[in-house]
């Protein structure tokens, strides 16, 4: 069946009205620019003939009702449909689940009204195309947030995918399903961004021939592929951190086969910050030191703090390079073991920003 549709992705908006901003000297996210950055994206998207916009979670700074209200009102003004899911920042406590979904009944969750307050849904986003929005935000016995899909939701997902009425199923979930950096499921930088029971989810998706998952949370531009599950995990960076990216995607199914054309763009300037790219890269560099030290002093390197500190100046932009996508690293002056480990963070295929993915395997 021939298909052709266009959609955009903007992730981890972290919308924060000025009076709600949490002021902290080590604050990593440029939430004061969340609204102007999003408005710039909407301005650029206004020139396109979009079929829908996808927002894969962390819609707000910390789940503040007034930030959800502002965003839902703004989304309702757009000329194309918008579909959202919850991120960990949107539901910081167990009780906030029931407060989240009512804000977004026009943006995906309306199809779940037979089960009020379920933070997951399915809906048709284009003729013969279904979007499944999953919830990966759970809490452990100590009340700490974890990335996990509960059994009830997985049973629901299997049931939904048994319906073969759609030519294409797309899935969106906040936590990463595949690794987007070296050793992500185990290293000190990336582990908490992974879905804890990703293997079970991937098996379900593979059995249903689902090939495309759209995630957020990590704040990096990356596309990962699993040959085992024939699955792409396309994660998009945050609009409140370098490089302030968004994506425009064209899905095409014709006599040549099925493919997804991906183009990535950046918000480089806003009225409040003329050179946003430079400013935010330096902001990230200024605040990356604790994360780099943690990576160096934790397994598998286990460097002493004293020695790790001697390496950090050359790693000032390490995270910024990863966030930008398609990063390639060389550290010829580092000890061999450290060099080998850090250079393994270089990007591997497929490309992260601009690429056409063939879906015909």
Regions found by a protein language model. Name each.
Residues 12, 53, 58, 71, ...:
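Divalent metal-coordination and catalytic microenvironments
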Residues 1-8, 118, 122-133, 164-168, ...:
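Beta-strand-turn-beta hairpins that frame and shape the catalytic cleft
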Residues 43-52, 130, 144-232, 318, ...:
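His/acidic metal-ligating clusters that form di-metal
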Residues 11-36, 92-113, 140-149, 185-190, ...:
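Acidic/histidine-rich helix-loop elements
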Residues 16-19, 61-64, 88-95, 139-142, ...:
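Active-site environment of divalent metal-dependent phosphoester hydrolases
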């Amino acid at each position: 069946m021939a298909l052709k549709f266009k959609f955009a992705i903007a992730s981890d908006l972290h919308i924060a009205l000025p009076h709600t901003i949490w002021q902290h000297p080590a604050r990593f996210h440029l939430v004061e620019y969340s609204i102007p950055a999003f408005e710039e994206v909407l301005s650029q998207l206004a020139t396109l003939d979009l079929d829908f916009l996808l927002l894969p979670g962390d819609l707000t700074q910390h789940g503040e009702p007034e930030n959800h209200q502002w965003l839902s009102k703004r989304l309702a003004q757009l000329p194309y449909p918008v579909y959202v899911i919850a991120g960990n920042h949107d539901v910081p406590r167990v009780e906030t689940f029931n407060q989240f979904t009512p804000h977004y009944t026009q943006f995906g969750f309306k199809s779940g009204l037979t089960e009020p307050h379920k933070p997951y849904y399915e809906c048709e986003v284009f003729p013969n195309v279904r979007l499944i929005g999953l919830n990966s935000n759970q809490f452990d016995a100590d009340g700490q947030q974890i990335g996990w899909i509960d059994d009830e939701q997985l049973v629901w997902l299997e049931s939904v995918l048994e319906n073969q009425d759609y030519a294409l199923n797309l899935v969106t979930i906040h936590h990463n399903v595949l690794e987007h950096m070296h050793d992500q499921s185990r290293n000190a930088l990336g582990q908490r961004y992974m879905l804890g029971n990703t293997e079970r989810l991937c098996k379900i998706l593979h059995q249903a021939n689902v090939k495309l998952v759209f995630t957020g949370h990590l704040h990096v531009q990356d596309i990962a592929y699993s040959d085992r599950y024939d699955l792409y995990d396309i994660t998009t960076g945050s609009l409140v951190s370098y490089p302030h990216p968004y994506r425009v995607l064209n899905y095409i199914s014709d006599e040549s086969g099925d493919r997804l054309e991906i183009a990535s763009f950046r918000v480089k300037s806003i009225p409040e910050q003329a050179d946003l790219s430079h400013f935010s890269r330096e902001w990230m560099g200024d605040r990356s030191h604790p994360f780099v030290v943690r990576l160096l002093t934790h397994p598998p390197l286990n460097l002493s703090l004293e020695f790790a500190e001697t390496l950090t100046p050359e790693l000032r932009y390490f995270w910024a390079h990863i966030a930008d996508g398609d990063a390639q690293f060389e550290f010829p002056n580092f000890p061999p073991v450290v060099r080998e480990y850090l250079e393994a963070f270089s990007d591997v295929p497929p490309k992260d920003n601009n690429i056409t993915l063939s879906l015909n395997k």
